[in-house]
Amino acid sequence: MQLVGREANRFHFLSDSDRLTEDDKKIYHAMISLSDGMYSMNEEVLISSLKILSELLYKHYGKKTILLIDEYDVPLDKAFQNGYYKEMTTLIRGMFGEALKTNDSLQFAVLTGCLRVSKVKYFYRT
C-alpha cells in the first residue's frame, strides 16, 4: 500500500487538473490520503489503483498509458518466504486483472521478473 501511495503521489498535479471531474479527484485523493503518516487507502482502492491511475492520466493527457512493472515476482517471493503468499497472490491477481485485462486507458504493459522460474518453488505449487 505504501509503495502504491508513493507512486500515486508522484502525479499530484492531477489534483488540479481541469480535465478531471470532482469525482475523479476524490478517487485520486483516496489513493494519496495519509493517516498517521502512512497511506491509508482501502482494499478496493488498492486493488484498482493501477487502473485508476492509468484512467486519470489518460483523461489528463488524452493519450493511453503505458504501464511498466519491474520485478513483479519479488513481492510474490517475499510473501512465499514469509507465510502470506495466498494474500499476496489475491492482491496481485486483482491489481493486474483490473489494470491489464479491463482497462480501456491502457496502450500496453510490460512486466519483468528477476527470479529464475526453474528455481522458484511456488510456481510449481498445486
Language model features with spans:
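Phosphate-binding site recognition
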Residues: M1-T126
